[in-house]
Amino acid sequence: MDGSGEQPRGGGPTSSEQIMKTGALLLQGFIQDRAGRMGGEAPELALDPVPQDASTKKLSECLKRIGDELDSNMELQRMIAAVDTDSPREVFFRVAADMFSDGNFNWGRVVALFYFASKLVLKALCTKVPELIRTIMGWTLDFLRERLLGWIQDQGGWDGLLSYFGTPTWQTVTIFVAGVLTASLTIWKKMG
Protein backbone atom coordinates (compact mmCIF):
# COMPACT_ATOMS: atom_id res chain seq x y z
CA MET A 1 0.00 0.00 0.00
CA ASP A 2 1.25 3.46 -0.78
CA GLY A 3 -1.03 5.28 1.66
CA SER A 4 -3.49 6.27 -1.07
CA GLY A 5 -5.99 3.62 0.00
CA GLU A 6 -5.52 1.73 -3.25
CA GLN A 7 -3.65 -1.46 -3.87
CA PRO A 8 -0.87 -0.90 -6.38
CA ARG A 9 -1.19 -4.38 -7.96
CA GLY A 10 -4.49 -3.94 -9.78
CA GLY A 11 -6.70 -5.20 -6.95
CA GLY A 12 -8.97 -2.20 -7.33
CA PRO A 13 -9.64 0.72 -5.06
CA THR A 14 -9.93 -0.33 -1.43
CA SER A 15 -10.38 2.98 0.36
CA SER A 16 -13.53 3.14 2.47
CA GLU A 17 -14.79 6.12 0.50
CA GLN A 18 -14.26 4.44 -2.88
CA ILE A 19 -15.85 1.16 -1.78
CA MET A 20 -18.94 2.98 -0.48
CA LYS A 21 -19.15 5.13 -3.63
CA THR A 22 -18.89 2.08 -5.89
CA GLY A 23 -21.31 0.17 -3.66
CA ALA A 24 -23.87 2.98 -3.93
CA LEU A 25 -23.49 3.05 -7.74
CA LEU A 26 -23.85 -0.73 -7.97
CA LEU A 27 -26.87 -0.80 -5.65
CA GLN A 28 -28.62 2.04 -7.47
CA GLY A 29 -27.93 0.49 -10.87
CA PHE A 30 -29.03 -2.95 -9.70
CA ILE A 31 -32.31 -1.65 -8.29
CA GLN A 32 -32.99 0.48 -11.39
CA ASP A 33 -32.34 -2.54 -13.59
CA ARG A 34 -34.67 -4.76 -11.53
CA ALA A 35 -37.41 -2.08 -11.65
CA GLY A 36 -36.96 -1.67 -15.41
CA ARG A 37 -37.26 -5.41 -15.97
CA MET A 38 -40.50 -5.38 -14.01
CA GLY A 39 -41.80 -2.73 -16.38
CA GLY A 40 -41.94 -0.21 -13.59
CA GLU A 41 -40.94 3.35 -14.08
CA ALA A 42 -39.15 4.52 -10.99
CA PRO A 43 -38.64 8.28 -11.09
CA GLU A 44 -37.75 7.99 -7.40
CA LEU A 45 -34.64 6.10 -8.46
CA ALA A 46 -33.60 8.48 -11.21
CA LEU A 47 -30.39 10.20 -10.29
CA ASP A 48 -27.97 12.03 -12.51
CA PRO A 49 -26.07 9.40 -14.46
CA VAL A 50 -22.62 8.94 -13.03
CA PRO A 51 -19.85 7.97 -15.43
CA GLN A 52 -18.78 4.39 -14.74
CA ASP A 53 -15.36 3.02 -15.44
CA ALA A 54 -14.92 -0.32 -17.20
CA SER A 55 -14.56 -2.21 -13.91
CA THR A 56 -17.84 -0.82 -12.50
CA LYS A 57 -19.62 -1.67 -15.75
CA LYS A 58 -18.35 -5.26 -15.52
CA LEU A 59 -19.50 -5.45 -11.90
CA SER A 60 -22.95 -4.11 -12.87
CA GLU A 61 -23.28 -6.71 -15.63
CA CYS A 62 -22.26 -9.46 -13.22
CA LEU A 63 -24.93 -8.35 -10.71
CA LYS A 64 -27.58 -8.13 -13.45
CA ARG A 65 -26.90 -11.69 -14.61
CA ILE A 66 -27.14 -13.03 -11.07
CA GLY A 67 -30.34 -11.03 -10.52
CA ASP A 68 -31.85 -12.52 -13.68
CA GLU A 69 -31.06 -16.01 -12.44
CA LEU A 70 -32.49 -15.32 -8.98
CA ASP A 71 -35.67 -13.93 -10.55
CA SER A 72 -36.33 -17.39 -11.99
CA ASN A 73 -36.09 -19.15 -8.59
CA MET A 74 -39.78 -19.65 -7.78
CA GLU A 75 -39.29 -20.75 -4.16
CA LEU A 76 -37.27 -17.63 -3.44
CA GLN A 77 -39.84 -15.41 -5.18
CA ARG A 78 -42.68 -16.98 -3.19
CA MET A 79 -40.86 -16.37 0.11
CA ILE A 80 -40.00 -12.78 -0.78
CA ALA A 81 -43.62 -12.12 -1.81
CA ALA A 82 -44.74 -13.35 1.61
CA VAL A 83 -42.51 -10.89 3.49
CA ASP A 84 -44.65 -8.49 5.48
CA THR A 85 -43.54 -4.94 4.79
CA ASP A 86 -45.51 -3.31 7.60
CA SER A 87 -42.22 -2.86 9.45
CA PRO A 88 -39.70 -2.89 6.58
CA ARG A 89 -36.78 -1.59 8.63
CA GLU A 90 -37.07 -4.46 11.10
CA VAL A 91 -37.48 -6.98 8.28
CA PHE A 92 -34.48 -5.64 6.38
CA PHE A 93 -32.09 -5.56 9.32
CA ARG A 94 -33.18 -8.93 10.70
CA VAL A 95 -32.73 -10.67 7.36
CA ALA A 96 -29.47 -8.80 6.64
CA ALA A 97 -28.04 -9.57 10.08
CA ASP A 98 -29.04 -13.21 9.76
CA MET A 99 -27.28 -13.54 6.40
CA PHE A 100 -23.98 -12.72 8.11
CA SER A 101 -24.72 -14.03 11.63
CA ASP A 102 -22.30 -16.95 11.35
CA GLY A 103 -19.40 -14.57 10.68
CA ASN A 104 -18.76 -16.07 7.25
CA PHE A 105 -18.58 -13.33 4.65
CA ASN A 106 -18.54 -13.98 0.91
CA TRP A 107 -19.61 -12.29 -2.30
CA GLY A 108 -22.67 -14.51 -2.65
CA ARG A 109 -24.05 -13.08 0.56
CA VAL A 110 -23.25 -9.51 -0.48
CA VAL A 111 -25.17 -10.11 -3.73
CA ALA A 112 -28.04 -11.68 -1.75
CA LEU A 113 -28.20 -8.49 0.36
CA PHE A 114 -28.43 -6.33 -2.78
CA TYR A 115 -31.08 -8.64 -4.24
CA PHE A 116 -33.19 -8.56 -1.07
CA ALA A 117 -32.93 -4.75 -0.93
CA SER A 118 -34.04 -4.53 -4.58
CA LYS A 119 -37.06 -6.73 -3.84
CA LEU A 120 -38.07 -4.52 -0.90
CA VAL A 121 -37.73 -1.45 -3.14
CA LEU A 122 -39.90 -3.08 -5.82
CA LYS A 123 -42.51 -3.89 -3.15
CA ALA A 124 -42.43 -0.23 -2.11
CA LEU A 125 -42.97 0.81 -5.74
CA CYS A 126 -45.90 -1.61 -6.12
CA THR A 127 -47.52 -0.47 -2.89
CA LYS A 128 -47.00 3.17 -3.76
CA VAL A 129 -44.66 3.93 -0.89
CA PRO A 130 -41.96 5.72 -2.90
CA GLU A 131 -40.43 7.47 0.11
CA LEU A 132 -39.36 4.04 1.31
CA ILE A 133 -37.11 3.50 -1.72
CA ARG A 134 -34.33 5.89 -0.71
CA THR A 135 -34.69 4.70 2.86
CA ILE A 136 -34.10 1.05 1.90
CA MET A 137 -31.10 2.04 -0.21
CA GLY A 138 -29.77 3.98 2.79
CA TRP A 139 -30.25 0.98 5.10
CA THR A 140 -28.39 -1.24 2.66
CA LEU A 141 -25.46 1.17 2.41
CA ASP A 142 -25.42 1.66 6.20
CA PHE A 143 -25.25 -2.11 6.68
CA LEU A 144 -22.52 -2.31 4.05
CA ARG A 145 -20.52 0.43 5.79
CA GLU A 146 -20.97 -0.95 9.32
CA ARG A 147 -20.70 -4.71 8.72
CA LEU A 148 -19.13 -5.42 5.31
CA LEU A 149 -16.74 -2.59 4.47
CA GLY A 150 -13.68 -4.12 6.18
CA TRP A 151 -14.30 -7.47 4.54
CA ILE A 152 -14.69 -5.89 1.07
CA GLN A 153 -11.43 -4.00 1.63
CA ASP A 154 -9.71 -7.27 2.58
CA GLN A 155 -10.91 -8.78 -0.73
CA GLY A 156 -9.20 -6.02 -2.74
CA GLY A 157 -12.34 -3.91 -3.19
CA TRP A 158 -15.31 -4.62 -5.43
CA ASP A 159 -13.07 -6.22 -8.08
CA GLY A 160 -13.02 -9.28 -5.83
CA LEU A 161 -16.65 -9.86 -6.85
CA LEU A 162 -15.59 -10.49 -10.44
CA SER A 163 -12.93 -12.96 -9.36
CA TYR A 164 -15.36 -14.78 -7.08
CA PHE A 165 -18.09 -15.14 -9.67
CA GLY A 166 -15.65 -15.81 -12.49
CA THR A 167 -14.89 -19.34 -11.31
CA PRO A 168 -18.12 -21.22 -10.52
CA THR A 169 -20.90 -21.68 -13.03
CA TRP A 170 -23.76 -19.18 -12.93
CA GLN A 171 -26.13 -21.95 -11.93
CA THR A 172 -24.01 -22.86 -8.91
CA VAL A 173 -23.77 -19.22 -7.86
CA THR A 174 -27.51 -18.71 -8.23
CA ILE A 175 -28.33 -21.78 -6.17
CA PHE A 176 -25.93 -20.61 -3.46
CA VAL A 177 -27.26 -17.03 -3.30
CA ALA A 178 -30.88 -18.21 -3.40
CA GLY A 179 -30.11 -20.69 -0.62
CA VAL A 180 -28.59 -18.03 1.64
CA LEU A 181 -31.53 -15.69 1.12
CA THR A 182 -34.14 -18.45 1.48
CA ALA A 183 -32.55 -19.65 4.72
CA SER A 184 -32.45 -16.09 6.09
CA LEU A 185 -36.10 -15.49 5.20
CA THR A 186 -37.12 -18.81 6.76
CA ILE A 187 -35.32 -18.01 10.01
CA TRP A 188 -36.80 -14.51 10.03
CA LYS A 189 -40.35 -15.87 9.57
CA LYS A 190 -39.88 -18.31 12.46
CA MET A 191 -38.55 -15.54 14.71
CA GLY A 192 -41.14 -13.00 13.58
Swiss-Prot record:
There is a cross-link at K128, K190 (Glycyl lysine isopeptide (Lys-Gly) (interchain with G-Cter in ubiquitin)). Ubiquitinated in the absence of XRCC6/Ku70. Ubiquitination promotes protein degradation. Ubiquitinated on Lys-128 and Lys-190. 'Lys-63'-linked polyubiquitin chains on Lys-128 are removed by USP12. It comes from the Eukaryota. A motif (BH1) lies at residues 98-118. The modification N-acetylmethionine is found at M1. A motif (BH3) lies at residues 59-73. A motif (BH2) lies at residues 150-165. Pfam families: Bcl-2 (PF00452). Expressed in a wide variety of tissues. Isoform Psi is found in glial tumors. Isoform Alpha is expressed in spleen, breast, ovary, testis, colon and brain, and at low levels in skin and lung. Isoform Sigma is expressed in spleen, breast, ovary, testis, lung, colon, brain and at low levels in skin. The chain crosses the membrane at residues 172-192. GO terms for biological process: apoptotic mitochondrial changes; apoptotic process; apoptotic process involved in blood vessel morphogenesis; apoptotic process involved in embryonic digit morphogenesis; apoptotic process involved in mammary gland involution; apoptotic signaling pathway; B cell apoptotic process; B cell homeostasis. One of its GO terms (cellular component) is membrane. Keywords: Acetylation, Apoptosis, Cytoplasm, Host-virus interaction, Isopeptide bond, Membrane, Mitochondrion, Mitochondrion outer membrane, Nucleus, Transmembrane, Transmembrane helix, Tumor suppressor, Ubl conjugation. SUPFAM superfamilies: Bcl-2 inhibitors of programmed cell death. The keyword Cell inner membrane does not apply. The keyword S-adenosyl-L-methionine does not apply. One of its GO terms (molecular function) is lipid binding. PANTHER family: APOPTOSIS REGULATOR BAX (PTHR11256:SF42), BCL-2 RELATED (PTHR11256). Belongs to the Bcl-2 family. Homodimer. Forms higher oligomers under stress conditions. Forms heterooligomers with BAK. Interacts with BCL2L11. Interaction with BCL2L11 promotes BAX oligomerization and association with mitochondrial membranes, with subsequent release of cytochrome c. Forms heterodimers with BCL2, BCL2L1 isoform Bcl-X(L), BCL2L2, MCL1 and A1. Interacts with SH3GLB1. Interacts with humanin; forms fibers with humanin which results in BAX conformational changes and sequestering of BAX into the fibers, preventing BAX activation. Interacts with SFN and YWHAZ; the interaction occurs in the cytoplasm. Plays a role in the mitochondrial apoptotic process. Under normal conditions, BAX is largely cytosolic via constant retrotranslocation from mitochondria to the cytosol mediated by BCL2L1/Bcl-xL, which avoids accumulation of toxic BAX levels at the mitochondrial outer membrane (MOM). Under stress conditions, undergoes a conformation change that causes translocation to the mitochondrion membrane, leading to the release of cytochrome c that then triggers apoptosis. Promotes activation of CASP3, and thereby apoptosis. This is Apoptosis regulator BAX. The lineage of its organism: Eukaryota, Metazoa, Chordata, Craniata, Vertebrata. The gene is BAX.
